[in-house]
């Protein structure tokens, strides 16, 4: 298989991070642990979800200190999460994620 394009890997990374959030892997440290991606990449990917019209927001834990909480997907926009679930092995292989 040839090397995947940067466009494909960027798209798949966004889909995979959105999927992880929807499955409860919903903090930057948890995303880093699940994927092995650096903190900055995880943060940039979270920000980039809006470019796919995926609505993702940070929800502060009530009564917790500053920036303690988790991310939540409130709208998948044009993305079908069932497609992501069906293609998880391909997505993870393309991104070299465990």
Task: Please report, for each region that a protein language model flagged, where it lies by residue.
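The alpha-helix within a helix-turn-helix
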Residues: 31-33
